[in-house]
Regions:
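A hydrophobic, helix-centered structural microdomain
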Residues: 1-59, 89, 155, 160
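A short, structured surface patch at a secondary-structure boundary
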Residues: 65-123
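Short, hydrophobic secondary-structure boundary micro-motifs
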Residues: 24, 38-39, 98-100, 106, ...
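Short, solvent-exposed loop/helix junctions and linker helices
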Residues: 1, 17, 66, 77-81, ...
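A cross-family signal for key residues in well-ordered alpha-helices
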Residues: 24, 73, 88, 129, ...
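Short, glycine-rich, amphipathic interfacial segments at transmembrane boundaries or analogous
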Residues: 36-74, 126-144
């Protein structure tokens, strides 16, 4: 049922998010040039890797991330518009609207058995950890929220 609701929500709201995505892509292209997208291997359900696509927010290069992040990129991240391409992953069945955020596959060996439970569900565009503190949380707190979500997942929790 969750999958059906995810797809329905993405399709029904496409009239809003597709034009926003096209506009954001044009802004990235004007500010940073090509490539427009940032692609990275992330761990999905059951730890299966998939290629996550986001709008690029940084200049390319070897400098630290803080130095490569542009003003446009900072704005895209603050508004979460950089994550609009992830709606495509929801349509493909690689992600859900709500679930633990997908992390790079290189972290898989570092999870404790309890933390690895976050992969029992599809990763989400937003998650319980993001709703309850986002970047102000420690990694331990984020993983605890992720596992709590896995244990308590419901339509009403997603709507909340």
């Amino acid at each position: 049922m969750k999958r059906v609701l995810d797809v329905a929500a993405v399709v029904l709201t496409a009239v809003v998010w597709v034009p926003l995505l096209l506009l954001a892509m044009a802004v990235v292209w004007a500010a940073l040039g090509r490539p427009i997208f940032f692609v990275q291997e992330r761990a999905g359900r059951d730890g299966r890797p998939f290629r996550l696509v986001k709008l690029r927010t940084m200049r390319e290069g070897d400098a630290p991330d803080a130095e490569r992040l542009t003003r446009v990129g900072r704005w895209l991240r603050a508004t979460s518009l950089d994550e609009l391409p992830e709606l495509w992953h929801v349509l493909r069945g690689e992600m859900s609207l709500v679930g633990p955020r997908p992390l790079p596959v290189r972290y898989l060996p570092r999870y404790s058995p309890q933390q690895a439970r976050r992969h029992e569900v599809r990763p989400g565009i937003t998650g319980w950890a993001q709703v309850n503190g986002r970047n102000s949380l420690t990694w331990e707190q984020k993983f605890a929220y992720d596992v709590w979500y896995v244990d308590h997942m419901s339509f009403w929790l997603d709507v909340k």
